[in-house]
């Protein structure tokens, strides 16, 4: 195996880890924040961008604060960040957009897009280090987190060199479309789809807004983007997830090159072990590995009302991740 596809890339930790081990990676996610992370951590190569990125970051660090949409929405209407840091985010985001539009990130469009992604990821991660949350953006803490008092600090993301097998790529497609591309490009596809009603967009809605820079209508205490409410995915419904996952599996197996599928799913998900095994077993030998994990952070904290008070009780604190490895016939 020299090339791997990650079809639900999310934060790109898997794709970054694979690239660090020398694999050529095809990383896909339809959310803009996730595609930006993949462009930075999977597609962009250290030897191409590190020096230019550090030069731009050094200049961006010197910008004076300039409060705008981000400050108003996430620091005043909500309390995710201190206003001083919010105003710096606004200023830096506006300058990245200006440089991109003015062609100051390079003459080659593909390389300029990679450099823009690196700068945006640096800003996302800088803001993440000074937020007042438990790690996801469904809610902010009732009392300020100590780290929220720190100053925003831009750092160069951990870029990696190109893989020996060739350039890695980031896609921003629906999973089934990316699977069709992967079928003849990679040896193994990794599928880690949403497994219940919780949308990743809602967990990271601030990063989606920061990357898109579209100043959307916001709602609720957390000031989520309106499309968190409007965008629907079959993977987030009991009735839709089985046919949606089956379609992605069939698409990934539609080509000649791909020999292995690795599917990750939680025992808290809408599908049980037997259902997933039944999807995979007609195509070859299936091995199932079970691993014990702490539950996601929101489940461990419990449910809170709009006033920030806990309601109800927390259930079990651990769950099982099931890994289904298909070796194709």
Stretches with model-predicted labels:
Residues 26, 169-171, 287-289:
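General small-molecule cofactor/ligand-binding pocket signal
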Residues 3-78, 87, 91-97, 117-120, ...:
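SAM cofactor-binding core of SAM-dependent methyltransferases
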